[in-house]
């Protein structure tokens, strides 16, 4: 009725100058073009200062992309790309406009007509529903689409949720409801292993940080790298334990997700520098070469160690700030955004694997020619343990995460998941054991400190 009344009032008027993304209709009024809606919410208007804003079909549920199709908003419409069906191409789909008719439902076009007629009379339909649930649920605002015989999110958006109440906003009137999407079910055993393993790692990392800071005789380029890696791992694991499930408020959750993104990328960047330093140290066994390369790297390792993650986070936050925070305070797994983390990690793991096997090859060929001081290490078991542990300290074991897909099957997937969790949560323990407890100088310092402690009678 409000819409008809407005048309009657405008029937005798001439069409005014229409703003950008609007056109004249019936020579009497302006209306926003398909894919746009007026900022005021009105369908018809005379005011040339009115703004026609792009409708984000991907976020509002108006897009008609098929299941697993990639939805990407663009000015005045959207595109659907089926590249997302193939895991390896997710990141590619996020940076190019690969559009294909088969990716749409019923080959529909990538534009959406503004369905906000009810706003003409000043009505802004909203509804709320008390719903039980925890922080790890997702509330979806829907209405019943009789022609399709199912629920639809078209024209409805989620406004706010707390522990017991959900508020929605829709641009039309119908029979509304709130669907509760439960978070993916967690394996309770894996959860316990993660919490216990990370707690032990935090203790070992704290002791390692104290060792690298206080033991002056061992302070050099190597210990600087170990210290920065230990700091990043300590902060990342601590934030993971305390903040990964703090999904409310959403802004805080997004900040936590961004910090975790930065800290874990920084961890892997320092692992890369560790691998590079290990390779150069083994290749240049002479003291003079070792010293010169150490001084050279020390000048650049801090800008590289923290600069590269900062650049990646800045670009990710600019491109998709809404992709931080899901059922947990981490990155969204759809639309290829997760590759802003997995991409750099995959590259670093591959590079460190190359460094690791080159180091083994060099040591194998030069072991007999090492100087007398180094050759005094005759315990083969200790050397073997150090060599294997170094593979995990360099982060290569994180590569198991790339094989945690449905195609491997439930049994193999469980084995990979448990191996991944146990090994990587104990990375801090291995770092402390290899670089502190198995370091002869550190052991001598610890023994000297213990000897100074007065014994009680």
UniProtKB/Swiss-Prot annotation:
Task: Provide GO CC annotations from the record.
Answer: extracellular region; membrane; plasma membrane
Keywords linked to the UniProt accession: Calcium, Cell membrane, Disulfide bond, EGF-like domain, G-protein coupled receptor, Glycoprotein, Membrane, Receptor, Repeat, Secreted, Signal, Transducer, Transmembrane, Transmembrane helix
Would the keyword Disulfide bond be found if you checked this record's keyword annotation? yes
Q: Which residues form the signal peptide?
A: 1-14
What does UniProt say on post-translational modification here? Glycosylated. Proteolytically cleaved into 2 subunits, an extracellular alpha subunit and a seven-transmembrane subunit.
SMART domains named in the record: EGF_CA (SM00179), GPS (SM00303)
Q: Which residues are glycosylated?
A: 26, 106, 162, 245
Tell me which domain of life the UniProt entry assigns to the organism this sequence originates from.
Eukaryota
For this protein, the parts annotated as crossing the membrane are: 192-212, 224-244, 251-271, 300-320, 337-357, 385-405, 414-434
One GO BP on record is: G protein-coupled receptor signaling pathway
SS bond partners: 15-24, 18-30, 32-52, 58-71, 65-80, 82-103, 141-168, 156-170
What would be an example GO MF term here?
A: calcium ion binding
In this entry, the parts of the chain located on the Cytoplasmic side of the membrane are 213-223, 272-299, 358-384, 435-457
The EGF-like domain covers: 15-53, 54-104
Site (Cleavage): give the residues.
173-174
**Which residue intervals make up region (GPS)?**
141-186
Q: Does the keyword Electron transport apply?
A: no
Q: Which residues lie on this side of the membrane: Extracellular?
A: 16-191, 245-250, 321-336, 406-413
Which residues does the UniProt record annotate as the domain GAIN-B?
134-186
> Cross-referenced PANTHER family, in alphabetical order?
ADHESION G PROTEIN-COUPLED RECEPTOR E4P-RELATED, ADHESION G-PROTEIN COUPLED RECEPTOR
Tell me, how does this one assemble?
Forms a heterodimer, consisting of a large extracellular region (alpha subunit) non-covalently linked to a seven-transmembrane moiety (beta subunit).
Q: Record's family?
A: Belongs to the G-protein coupled receptor 2 family. Adhesion G-protein coupled receptor (ADGR) subfamily.
Q: What does this protein do?
A: May mediate the cellular interaction between myeloid cells and B-cells.
Q: What is this protein called?
A: Putative adhesion G protein-coupled receptor E4P
